[in-house]
Amino acid sequence: MSSLRFTEEDFRTFTIEGLDARMSVLKDTVRPKLQGLGDHFAPVLSALTGDEMFVHVAKHARRSVNPPDDSWVAFANNKRGYKKLPHFQIGLWETHVFVWFALIYESPLKQEYGQLFKKHLPDIESSIPSRFFWSADHTKPDAKRQSEMNEKDLENLFERLVNVKKAEALCGIQLSKDEVLHMSEEAFLSEIEAAFEKLAFLYRLTQKVSV
């Protein structure tokens, strides 16, 4: 099949005006690539986590006015959905690619995960590379590098999972558009796989919480 690395055209999708026009290009160019990345990495993540991982490509079906500013493929251990579960994502904004482990606001066990992450904070700091990013909102492109956060910053992020209904915690890497465009497909896929190898630690922590 065609390359799984994102191209200038893929990034440019998110500058197209209008919901219908942007969605048309998204469906034709970006979505097949997200599906391809899903098919490529689902067995990798299944092996890393011990859970069978299912692929969920974002459909943006609820949008009626505003076009999406990003798109992604998610991986979760449930065939029917991913938003309530600890999951992984690969996606892109106009400016960069993201690779996340994600706990988002729909999760019914956020409080338990927050407590668990607070308890294992030293392990998380030592297991997650300092160049990785943390985000508190999957709907915004902003994220903070772990090297720029102290222990209290991380503790506050996890505390929000416990106490704030809409709180989220995402961890992973961001690759700028320029970086991605200068990578070979092999290097791009290797970078994502290396990130997942580190992020699997966070997923394995969540497996300690009984559902």
UniProtKB/Swiss-Prot annotation:
Membership in a protein family: Belongs to the UPF0637 family.
InterPro entries recorded: UPF0637, UPF0637_domain_sf
Biological source species: Bacillus licheniformis (strain ATCC 14580 / DSM 13 / JCM 2505 / CCUG 7422 / NBRC 12200 / NCIMB 9375 / NCTC 10341 / NRRL NRS-1264 / Gibson 46)
Lineage: superkingdom: Bacteria
Protein name: UPF0637 protein BLi01683/BL05149
